[in-house]
């Protein structure tokens, strides 16, 4: 571990801080009541919460602007799986090394440290953990994943999510799903049977959802012909209906190909903004599309889910508990 002393001091001792779930002393901050403003938000203000924008500070990996008129603060997303990619932070060993430890408690402590450094650097959601399996030996991102066994990966993913979420930071499960090679990843079509999908590729994501992950990030690839960001069966039937996921789904960065198709399939947030490869929706036509192609109903679902995540995050000052 390459540990930064200043980061360690600012984030505090990982084991000395109370978990968010059991901390009854924290006063609710501004974000704790953000959902109350939903009824006052205009359709335009709601729409701006569902598409990323550049971070004014230039520090966040992803940024949702909030609504200043209603006192709704922005959400800041930061990479990554091996340590916060901003400011003074710790460079942790690769996730595959964590997998080799066979130690869920170590994974929880890792997640807790990652979450605390996320908060200490002024961010809300960390883009971790990676929950894909190691299936292709030449995959360039195998180091981000816990291993090749679905049960083992599920245990470590759940523990990491528990650690992150316990600090008040949000965890992001990625990349949903079957993103197991990097070559041609934005065009690749993964053909996988239902049994293999359930037994191999989904367990780690299911474990992370059951543990309370705030965000799920879709993969670049197609699954059975449909892009993961436009896959209604995965986003709605599996994630929402079967698993009961109540957080927010986001695309991988520039991972959408059709804004309307993604939104109607169940994707909540397009990151980091309008994709350069997507079929774009001009602002002048967006309101029309919202009403004409069923996006108003999707907007009514996505925005409350956004608030649910906002309300789970702590401390208006951006500091950990």
Identify the residue ranges that each predicted region occupies.
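Glycoside hydrolase catalytic-domain context in secreted enzymes
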Residues: 1-321
